[in-house]
Amino acid sequence: MAGSAVSVICLGEALVDRLGPPAGDPAVDQPVDDRLGGAPANVACALARLGTPVVFAGRVGSDAIGASFVDLFARRGLDASLLQRDAVRPSRIVLVRRASNGERQFQGFAGDQRIGFADQALAPMSLPPA
């Protein structure tokens, strides 16, 4: 963030939405559709695509999902200097059930190793002065 003019800081979760097949259960039914998501990450990417200087502050696992977010943020031109990587906890996967009419219902999480998820362990950080 040094030397950059950040207009917006998006703080929060970066996760995977695991969409099950229509009328199926994303925990057990195939095929599933994994999508990078999380409202703060989505907003950060949208703002960057509009040309707004933005930094994302959050925490992801040191796993394939975390690597996908690092890559996505780089491709979108986001400042990810406040993105933390967790070597112990995994990135969060949200199970999303889709009704036959397309409505979505969030039904829980996948990948829990009984130690929580990376986004739950966000460490305090120094933010740039306003």
Where in the sequence are the language-model features?
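Glycine-rich phosphate/adenosyl-contacting loop at the front of the ribokinase-like
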Residues: 1-78, 120
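Conserved N-terminal subdomain of the carbohydrate kinase-like
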Residues: 53-130
